[in-house]
Amino acid sequence: MSLISDLKDYLRNRQLDCYILSEAPLILTSFWYDFQKNLAKLEKVIPQTEPIWFFFSIGNYKSELLVQEIKAKISEIHIKYPLYNFWFMNNSQEEDNYFQKAGLNSIFANHNTFLDENRYRIMNVKKKYDAIYLARFTLVKRHYLAKDIKKLLIIGTYKPDEIDYYNSSRAILDFATYKAKVLGIFITNYMNQAHVGLALSDFEGAMYASSEYLLSGLPVVSTPSLGGRDAYYRDDYVKIVEPDSRVVAEAVYELIKNPPDADMIRAETIKIMNHQRQSLINVIENIYQKAGTKRNFSSDWQRVFIHKLGLRTRIPFPIYRSRILRESRVLQPKK
């Protein structure tokens, strides 16, 4: 079976599960959950006789206990694949401390760091909504906390087992404007129609939408949370408030009354992103040097960088093959 057909088999839904950062030395990135799910299939197409580096985004918040479970899993994999090398890219400094305490290779590089800022812009358009909430209809998102906002835009879908939560949320927020789904390249258009972005969960990952608001120049009202979205928050343009619908609404209208500068919000967000990207670049630069690679990853970065590092991004397979795989000579199926 060829590499392409093997990958195509587990990318049937056109969801990317890994991305190549470097072919020589071979460096892959993936979400930790996706790596575990697809390890058996990855084994068929990645070489077993040379060192390989994996950089994992950790997804949802990882407690110290969960980090110990990850450490045990890594030890198990190392027994079978001693040439595999693992790095974890953490969404918060707290989580990074847990990983380092456990003796695992890790850096503080929030997955929102790898949003392509060029997909988002500040637009001079009329503000139709007081706030926008880009969030799937799932219990953790706590849509009901937006019930006291007068002009509200909600964008999000739901899974079959979330239908009850969806129906109850729609009943509570029957005044809101709803859109089930918007293509990612157009999401900034809708964000620019709102004054404020909402982030109302208390526990998840870094929440891409939170940073997408900021890159579109929107201030944010957030509740206290675990998961790392606050890595991009600054008091000048974010209000973190208690999970009470009246308090949330008050914060929204205060930001509307005294709006922060949109260009400043975007510029500060990109500054934070670039700082965290540099952490990844520095680590891979060190790998290059130890491998005797006569290249500079800082230069390679501009060539390999893609929105969200290509992870869980819906891209037609022909584009995946030509742009993401780059006709790799390293990734050959085992004979």
Residue ranges and their predicted role:
Residues P219-T223:
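Short hydrophobic beta-strand element within catalytic cores of glycosyltransferases
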Residues F114-T188:
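Conserved catalytic-core segment of nucleotide-activated headgroup transferases in glycan assembly
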Residues T138-K141, A199-S210, P224-S225, R229-Y232:
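Nucleotide-sugar-dependent
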Residues L183-A194, L215:
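Short acidic alpha-helix that forms the nucleotide-activated donor recognition element
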Residues R234-R246, E254-P259:
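Conserved acidic donor-binding segment of nucleotide-sugar-dependent glycosyltransferases
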Residues P243, I256-I319:
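A charged, aromatic-enriched C-terminal amphipathic alpha-helix characteristic of glycosyltransferases
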Residues W32, N38-L139:
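Catalytic core of nucleotide-activated saccharide and alditol-phosphate transferases
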Residues N192-G205, L218:
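Acidic donor-binding loop of glycosyltransferase active sites
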